[in-house]
Amino acid sequence: MRAGTGRAACHHGEILQGVFLDGRGRRVAGLVTLPLAGLGTRAEFTRRPGTAAVTVVPADRTKALRAATYALAECAAHGEEPLCGGELRLVGDVPVGLGMGSSSSDVIAAVRAVADAFGVRLAPEAVARLAVRAERASDPLMLDGRALLFAQREGRVLEDLGAALPPAVVVGCALGGGRSVDTLALPAPAPADDTDVPAYERLRGLLRQAVAAADPALLGHVATESARLRQRVLPHAEFTALTGIAGRVGALGVQVAHSGNVAGLLFDPAARDLRGRVRACRRALAATGIPATHTFHTTPTSATTSEEPPHGRAHRGSDRPPRPDTRGRRVRLPAL
């Protein structure tokens, strides 16, 4: 019985999400995520030759189970081996339902573990295709850190904006009391009208400039305007208070997960008295009843080659709460 392992990171919500034009002029849903190092999912897949069933632990990780099943068929065909069953085990620390890509992290770690069990190196594009097939829309976590405009429902890159987002310090917080959001209950994206696409394309151009110039102020502007547009789909009662705090403490802007309650205030790492600004921000959040979570820097993770790199052995650890449907439950993010 050969076991394979895989890992995947998560993110801290989106910098930009909306409807954009692809190279053929089609309207396509796309997003740019804010990478977050330190949290993620670790998967281990054990092949069971002579069996057909595929199981997963915890049992409620159905998207990861589907992804493992699809990856099994692909890897078996790639290696010209007979199809078999196996067991997938997942451990991780990504809070569920806050908009941090927990399901995508599970799915991508599962695909990587199956590929490792077969000794197959899947290209990131293949991992993206399997991830979208398993969960209908996937975050670009398989692409490990570049600043990308990614079509989450098609599993392809619309634009490579550059090696990394501009440097920024992010003071994380949780809106809605840290309650999880049932993403399946969110309204389906409405067809983009003639005013939506130009607005998002304008922000896309500004983000392109921000990445090229490593301009954190322009990054903060794009993130704030994208979050403001998203208020029409998933309104946050604290949004006005959040932007008000940003203005008072000298933040560059705010970013809000577009399918959850995690949010952040962005600061210039070179700002005068940065520590004082961060402390003032956390005090202002507490006074407003918005729990602060952790503070981190936007730093790129390892770059991806044309094929998936090895992701090492899975480490045992305390799993995140196994049930994704705890809508009223507050989730605490570990300090980084």
Describe the predicted segments one by one.
Residues 1-98, 308, 321-323, 327-336:
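ATP-binding N-lobe of GHMP and related small-molecule kinases
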Residues 12-18, 41-45, 139-142, 147-150, ...:
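Short beta-strand scaffold segments in enzyme catalytic cores
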Residues 93-105, 139:
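Gly/Ser-rich catalytic serine loop of serine hydrolases
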Residues 100-124:
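DPxDG-like acidic metal-binding loop motif
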Residues 123-249, 268-291, 295-336:
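ATP-dependent small-molecule kinase catalytic core of the GHMP/sugar-kinase superfamily
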Residues 239-240, 257-265:
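Small/polar glycine-rich anion-binding or flexible loop at a beta-alpha turn
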Residues 250-255:
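A short linear hydrophobic-aromatic micro-motif
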